[in-house]
């Protein structure tokens, strides 16, 4: 099992490989090792639109971390 945290200013759904699920930003996500394309649920008010990652060799205490930045309004 691998661990990922997707940071964003707001709580938002996280889309993994184009599949929405029960994942949320700012929480630890548990996924199998592998390559993933991470996006946020709408609205599209952030950059980048998608982040590709290779998830391997993580622990719950040292998860892979990515950040989406909210666009200026």
Give, region by region, the residue ranges found by the protein language model.
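Short loop/turn and low-complexity linker motifs enriched in small/turn-promoting residues
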Residues: 1-73
């Amino acid at each position: 099992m691998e661990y990922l945290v997707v940071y964003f200013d707001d709580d938002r759904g996280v889309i993994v490989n184009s599949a929405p699920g029960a994942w949320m930003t700012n929480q630890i996500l548990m996924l199998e090792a592998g390559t993933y394309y991470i996006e946020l649920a709408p609205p599209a008010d952030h950059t980048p639109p998608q982040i590709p990652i290779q998830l391997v060799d993580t622990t719950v205490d040292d998860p892979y971390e990515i950040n989406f930045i909210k666009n200026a309004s």
